[in-house]
UniProtKB/Swiss-Prot annotation:
GO CC entries: cytosol; nucleus
InterPro entries (UniProt xref): Phosphatase_reg/MetRdx (IPR051330), TIP41-like (IPR007303)
PANTHER family given in the database record: GAF/PUTATIVE CYTOSKELETAL PROTEIN (PTHR21021), TIP41-LIKE PROTEIN (PTHR21021:SF16)
GO MF entries: protein phosphatase activator activity
Annotated coiled-coil segments of the chain: none
Described function: Involved in negative regulation of the TOR signaling pathway in response to type of available nitrogen source. Activates the PP2A phosphatase ppa2.
Family recorded in the similarity comment: Belongs to the TIP41 family.
Protein name: Type 2A phosphatase activator tip41
GO biological process, any: negative regulation of TORC1 signaling
Chief localization: cytoplasm
Keywords, sorted A to Z: Cytoplasm, Nucleus, Signal transduction inhibitor
Origin superkingdom: Eukaryota
Protein localization: Cytoplasm; Nucleus
């Protein structure tokens, strides 16, 4: 059963739906749509959608995110334990699975779904006013969802989550994909949506980050909890190298 929550201010509304992971028949239907097995924990009914004057503008949806997972042979991570992942997906009584080429780490460039006809993001130099947000006081509203998560046959983690909060005059959303492939690399994509609720404009800040696994391990302090830090997405984000950064304004 899904739980719904929303917050409205002037012309803006943010809607959230959150539920449990997909059931087996739902996973099979999604696999048929995608052409590859979905992540172990796929929250297919979860979403966050932002509306302006009662019309959807931009949102984050599980199926849309997974549709952007690479499906070409060059997208497949060729590492020693890729076959271990494939074997982990065999059901009792099945033969070795036939899996079409796809990025089994579920890396996706998904930055949200534009829901409004004729709306488009235009690249600009303007930045999100971080200090104004920090000075705006405590949260008036907060919610978070997970779109999907997979432990990659105990060889790391792939997780896509979305968090949104409202402070006085501002709405801030962070959608984050973290793909950690142990002993190989760590990749992270962050999409921030910022809305000035008083002046009615929307910015999108997109960043891609990455580093080798060894580089991250070397930054763990002596005596630090390795497992906890590798699962701390904020800690990882601060230590990865930014390889791409673009900011857009939504025209609609």
């Amino acid at each position: 059963m899904q739980k719904q929550d929303d917050f409205s201010f002037k012309y803006w509304t943010i809607k959230v739906q959150r539920g449990s992971i997909l059931k087996s028949h739902e996973m099979e239907n999604l696999q048929s749509t995608l052409g590859f097995p979905p992540p172990e924990m796929t929250f297919g009914n979860n979403y966050i959608s932002i509306e302006y004057k009662n019309q959807p503008v931009v949102g984050f949806f599980t199926e849309d995110a997974l549709k952007m997972v690479g499906t070409k042979p060059e997208d497949v991570m060729q590492v020693s334990f890729a076959k271990d992942w494939a074997k982990s997906r065999i059901k009792p009584g099945e033969e070795y699975p036939v899996i079409y080429p796809f990025d089994w780490t579920y890396y996706t460039d998904y930055q949200g779904t534009i829901q409004r006809p004729n709306a488009k993001f235009i690249e600009i130099d303007q930045v999100i006013p971080v200090q104004k947000i920090l000075n705006a006081g405590q949260n008036l509203w907060f919610n978070e969802i997970i779109l999907f998560e997979d432990e990659l046959a105990d060889n790391g983690k792939s997780m896509f989550d979305v968090r949104a909060r409202v402070v006085q005059g501002h709405l801030i959303l962070l959608a984050r994909l973290v793909v950690r492939l142990d002993k190989v690399n760590v990749r992270l994509n962050e999409t921030r949506i910022y809305i000035d609720l008083l002046n009615d404009f929307l910015l999108k800040d997109c960043r891609k980050k990455q580093a080798t696994y060894d580089k991250i391990i070397k930054q763990i302090p002596v005596g630090g909890d390795k497992a906890a830090l590798l699962d701390d997405n904020n800690w990882l984000s601060e230590r990865l190298d930014t390889v791409d950064h673009k900011i857009y304004k939504l025209n609609f």
